[in-house]
From Swiss-Prot:
Highest taxon listed in the record's lineage: Bacteria
Keyword Cytoplasm: yes
Record note on quaternary structure: Homodimer.
Record's protein name: Adenine phosphoribosyltransferase
Gene name for this UniProt entry: apt
Keywords: Cytoplasm, Glycosyltransferase, Purine salvage, Transferase
Main location: cytoplasm
Enzyme Commission number: 2.4.2.7
Catalytic activity: AMP + diphosphate = 5-phospho-alpha-D-ribose 1-diphosphate + adenine
């Protein structure tokens, strides 16, 4: 598959020229991490000052809810950590790190979710989410939706409310958005799974 299989979704909010520039920086790596997979590497976007600026602008312009509707941004490990804090700082919000199990000091609360072959868990520090806190979840990619759903359950278990999701990329055909309980979401670009 070539770059032409990438569909510009909410990225169009920054204009055609900037959208095409950002897409041109997304690298397709066939056979990684295993044969039959095409890995979409957006690290070149982060390394390019213009690309990073476009990415952050696009994520903010494509927010699925108004900034007045959330108090914090929760970034999912690990690539949600790359742009989530910058978004939070620019919008005057706090940042919550949703980590893989065992990566945070005690006390934490966690949530498990199913993988194709087994289970995984995500955690937050117990004081990261206070009762009533409204949270926007951000990540680089929505595929099956398992991690985003687990993060939602975790934040809500802690007393918060997830108000929406912001993704850089969406893999179509895996029904990941179906696991988001109908909450508002946005993705900048879409591509086939």
């Amino acid at each position: 598959m070539a770059q032409s299989d990438i569909t510009i979704d909410a990225l169009s909010k920054v204009g055609q020229q900037d959208a095409e520039y950002l897409v041109s920086l997304v690298r397709s790596v066939p056979g990684f991490p295993k044969e039959g997979i095409i890995f979409r590497d957006f690290m070149p976007v982060l390394a390019d000052p213009k690309g990073l600026k476009i990415l952050l602008k696009a994520l903010e312009e494509a927010l699925p809810v108004s900034p007045s509707e959330f108090d914090s941004i929760a970034g999912l490990e690990s690539r949600g950590f790359l742009f989530g804090p910058a978004m939070a700082a620019h919008l005057g919000k706090g940042f919550i790190a949703v980590r893989k199990a065992g990566k945070l000091p005690p006390e934490t609360i966690g949530e498990s979710y199913d993988l194709e072959y087994g289970t995984a868990s995500v955690e937050i520090e117990t004081d990261a989410v206070q009762a009533g806190k409204r949270v926007l979840i951000v990540d680089d990619l929505i595929a099956t939706g398992g991690t985003a759903k687990a993060a939602t359950d975790l934040i809500e278990k802690a007393g918060g409310t997830v108000v929406g999701f912001s993704f850089v990329m969406r893999l179509d055909g895996l029904d990941g958005l179906d696991k988001l309980d109908g909450k508002p979401s946005s993705s900048l670009i879409a591509m086939p799974a």
